[in-house]
A protein has these predicted regions:
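Sensory beta-strand/linker motifs that couple input domains to effectors
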Residues: 16
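Short alpha-helical segment of the dimerization/phosphotransfer core of two-component systems
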Residues: 91-96
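Conserved catalytic submotifs in the C-terminal HATPase_c
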Residues: 81, 117-122, 139, 144-154, ...
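Primarily the dimerization/phosphotransfer
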Residues: 29-71
């Protein structure tokens, strides 16, 4: 109801009544739909977390026992072909555990249950460690990794485990989609606004704007990969973006077909640790 005085010199008022029942009904329906969607999302995330944990437990046993047999700790295995099969079992098991860990982390982030151990992180040191870990993969694919790390870079306040995963995911993606003879350049630098930025640039196949949008959706994969045989679950970039944002960092990606890709993760000045 709206009440207003009539401006004709008299002490008269006008009241206008509006029936807002349809609006209230629509509002109630929207709130209920939102509540149901949130409950469904939470239930999905909880289910993914539980199933990932249940699958990972027996997988660890498979990996562990295959490693024992590969090392022939209790005697020779015999035929060389068996040894190769054991290597395949061990490698595939390790890959599956890695995918499950990604799935578990993403489900925790969506449910708001990811635990972060915030501490001062030396971004340069962590980046160098990740480059060393990814160097064998780069060598196999004949891809060159170059680094350009800023000197006297202040530490950032972040969760070291998730930042390490961010760097490893970005390096793995760049190597995966860069042809033999190509380059991956990893750099750190301070920005004028006080933030610290981590950049991973490659000379790979690149993506169109539409493909970038697809790549950032969980479980979506691009059909134009030069490494089709190495496709994963489509969690790499979505998880990396989610981990960056969980650490209060911004995530951006620029790319063009046949012109490579640039990913930037910027930690704001408020996340700088006192030296």
């Amino acid at each position: 109801m709206t009440i207003g005085k009539i401006s004709d010199g008299t002490d008269r008022f006008c009241a206008i009544f509006r029936d807002i029942t349809p609006w209230k009904k629509s509002e109630s329906e929207l709130l209920n739909a939102k509540r149901v969607a949130e409950q469904a999302s939470s239930a999905k995330s909880d289910f993914l977390a539980k199933i990932s944990h249940e699958i990972r437990t027996p997988l660890n046993a498979i990996i562990g026992f295959s490693e024992v047999m590969m090392d022939e700790r209790f005697g020779p295995v015999g035929n060389e072909r068996y040894k190769q099969y054991l290597k395949d079992i061990h490698t595939s098991g390790g890959h599956l555990v890695s995918l499950l860990n990604d799935l578990l982390d993403l489900s925790k982030i969506e449910a708001g249950k990811l635990e972060l151990n915030i501490a001062a992180v030396d971004l340069n040191e962590l980046t160098q460690q990740c480059v060393a870990l990814m160097q064998p993969q780069a060598n196999r694919e004949r891809v060159i990794i170059r680094t350009s790390l800023a000197t006297s870079l202040p530490p950032v306040l972040a969760d070291a485990r998730s930042v390490r995963q961010i760097v490893l995911n970005l390096l793995s993606n760049s190597i995966k989609f860069t042809g033999a003879g190509g380059q991956v350049i990893v750099s750190t630098a301070p920005n004028d606004d006080g933030s610290i930025v981590l950049r991973v640039r490659d000379t790979g196949v690149g993506m169109s704007e539409k493909e970038i949008a697809i790549a950032l959706e969980p479980f979506r994969q691009l059909a134009t990969s030069i490494r089709r045989g190495q496709d994963g679950t489509g969690l790499g970039l979505p998880l990396t973006k989610a981990l960056a944002e969980a650490n209060r960092a911004s995530f951006s990606i620029k790319s063009a077909v046949n012109a490579g890709t640039l990913v930037e993760v910027a930690f704001p000045g408020s996340r700088m640790a006192a030296e």
